[in-house]
A protein has these predicted regions:
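Polar/charged low-complexity regulatory segments
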Residues: 2-186, 193-253
Length: 253
């Protein structure tokens, strides 16, 4: 693992001058032009939005997974059956009630899947990790960091410094899922979303930074480049499309 970290650090240094990433970005753009535009990810909206401006802002922090699950970005309502939510929450996180829901919120906030990734990232970039096990996710962090730079998702100097947005997006969605499972009240759901929003504002200064960290964390989660690519496609739609809550709601609103 230490060899992997040294190799990753060397790779990062080699990419600092920007020539390789520029060449790869141009090749990628040319390929997309040749292939033509794809249908892409749809940003769905409720026929009638019943949310306040503040509620819409909080929902925006959940947007990447709402789009991934083909749900409206401005509606609490869901077509999924409550028993489906209950089964999924128990399968994913052993959530069965209010207390276990709030326990997972705290776990995602303070550890989740970002702690080990952040430790590996800090070591790879020449720093010292504050927590987590850097060797646990070293290979996955190197793989996804190189993938994001090579594909023009970021430059070496704008590589995310944390994978926490992956866990924060899940916190924001968990609040809503737990509401529909019958474990949280609507007021508690908004409080959980506020936890995600407050943490996001602490770590990031823009929707772009938040989205880039989400894509990085999603990829590192299973060390899967396709997961990272899918996440970045969704993030790109949120950053670029006029109907996106990320275009309509300022980061510091």
């Amino acid at each position: 693992a230490r060899h992997n970290m040294a190799q990753a650090a060397a790779t990062m240094q080699a990419m600092q001058d920007g020539s390789l990433e520029k060449e790869l970005r141009e090749a990628n753009a040319a390929a997309l032009d040749w292939l033509g535009e794809e249908d892409g990810w749809e940003i769905r909206h409720a026929a009638t939005c019943r949310l306040t401006a503040e509620q819409r802002r909080l929902m925006a922090f959940a947007a990447p997974l709402l789009i991934y699950n083909d749900e409206a970005v401005d509606a609490v309502e869901s077509e999924v059956l409550p028993e489906t939510y209950r089964a999924q929450l128990q399968s994913w996180w052993n959530i069965t009630d209010r207390d276990s829901t709030l326990g997972i919120v705290q776990w995602l906030l303070h550890e989740g899947h970002h702690a080990d990734a952040d430790a590996a990232l800090a070591l790879m970039c020449g720093g010292q990790p504050d927590a987590g096990d850097p060797e646990e996710k070293a290979e996955d962090v190197q793989l996804i960091a190189e993938f994001m730079i090579e594909n023009g998702y970021c430059r070496a100097e704008t590589l995310p410094q944390t994978a926490i947005a992956w866990d924060l997006v899940r916190i924001a969605n968990l609040g809503r899922w737990a509401l529909h499972a019958g474990y949280l009240s609507e007021e508690e759901m908004w409080q959980v979303m506020q936890v995600a929003a407050d943490a996001a504002r602490e770590y990031f200064s823009s929707w772009e930074e938040y989205g880039r960290s989400f894509a990085f964390g999603r990829g590192v989660w299973h060390g899967d480049e396709e997961d990272c690519q899918t996440a970045w496609e969704i993030v790109s739609a949120l950053l670029e499309e006029e109907t996106s809550p990320w275009r309509q709601i300022p980061w510091n609103a």
